[in-house]
Each structure stands twice: as structure tokens, then as C-alpha cells.
Amino acid sequence: MKHLISLLAFSFLIGCDAEKSNKTKPPEAISVSPNLKYEIKGDAVAITRCDKKASGELIIPANIEGKPVTEIGTFAFSSCYGLTSITIPDSVTSIGDDAFARCASLTSITIPDSVTSIESTFSLCVSLTSITIPDSVTSIGEMTFLGCNSLKNITIGNSVTSIGDYAFLRCTSLTSITIPDSVTSIDKQAFKGCNSLTALTFLGDAPEIANDAFEQSSPTIYREPDAKGWGDTLAGRPVKLITEKP
């Protein structure tokens, strides 16, 4: 069952219910953008779409019709070019593929620590400058930040174990990243075209990594002195001790 949330329509329905029976208390109004579509899934709610004309700041409600919002669906906010800031409630546990892809004006978004995985979620968000991936997330899927060419600062949570194909492809403003010791694999072209990237600091053992992970990028790799599995290079890039970091 899909709905279009509309404050005007919602107020109208309340008025109609009140006219039918003055004994029935109207439902409490939902403070939410009028442009969201959602779907009831059992005891929970999934946000399925946002009007592409939406602009400025948007707050996703934690509850709709008395049920928690737990999911942001695939392509839900894709190509909402006018949105600059989105607040996601802590009730959300799942964010679908491409959920915020091509939100070209988006500069600020917080991933709640209830989410466990992201994939192609923010691709081509060309105005996004910084983001924190919470400790609840265990994987950064393929193309998650592809083409986010304004992204300068990223904090990767301590539970991430894998970085997928093209995850940071052409993030041309990134200069340095710290990789937590939880990361065990980095897939193909994960950092391709990150031509400003000069330093990757690894806090754990050497991960399994695709040979082309740093294609068209020239970072120096820094590692902990007591970490295992390291050689003089990683995917063709020089490896040094953290103590040698400038």
C-alpha cells in the first residue's frame, strides 16, 4: 500500500473524520515533508520515493501511522537535485542501493548507527564534502561514493570489513583516508582516479586487495609497525611505517 504524504490532504481527512463523529479523536498529525511516498510493510514503514522537486533541508520522520520507519528504499531520493540536507532517523536499519544517488546539491547527511550496509548509496553526490560511516556498518558496497568529487573528509567506522568495487572511484578531492583494522578486503578500482589522494593509513594487517585498486591514483601507504602481512608495496604503491609519516 503506497501513500503520498501531504499535509493538506492529511488535514482534510482529519476534518472529514471529525465531521463524521465527534466521539472519534482524530489521529495525531505527522510532521513530515509533504512530498514523501511510503509503503507499510507489516509493522514497519519503508520510504519509497521523494518528489524530485523537493529542495532544501528534509527530515525523514521516525514514525508514520504509528509504525517505525525502518527502510529507505532503492532509488528513494535518487536525482532529488534540490535537496541540500537530509536527516535520517535512528529507526532506519536498511538503506537501499542508489537511495541518494545523484543528489547533486546534497552537502550534509548523517548515517544513523542502526544501518549495517551501504551500496552505491551516494554515487554522484557531487556537493557532498564530508561523511561519517558509523561503527554499525560492516561493508562499503560497490560504487557507494563513486564520483563524489567534492568529498574531502570521510571517517570509516571500526566494523567495516570490506570496501567494494569502485567504492571511491573519482573522489578527486580526497587527500587522505584512515582504514580501520577491521578491513580485510578492498576490491577492484576502489580508489581509481582519486588523483589528490596522497596517503592511506592502515591500522591493521594487510588486506586482500585488487591489483588495480589504486589505478590512476598515487597514494603512499602507511602501516602500523606490528601489523602482519605487509611487504614493500600494496597494489603497486609504496608502503611505509606510520612513524615515517610526514
Spans of features found by a protein language model:
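Structural signature of tandem-repeat unit edges
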Residues: 35-45, 53-71, 81-94, 104-117, ...
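C-terminal motif of bacterial Sec signal peptides marking the signal peptidase cleavage site
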Residues: 14-15
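Short, aromatic/basic amphipathic alpha-helical patches
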Residues: 212-213, 228-240
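Residues that act as N-cap/strand-start positions at coil-to-secondary-structure junctions
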Residues: 30-32
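Short secondary-structure subsegments characteristic of cysteine-rich extracellular domains
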Residues: 10, 77-80
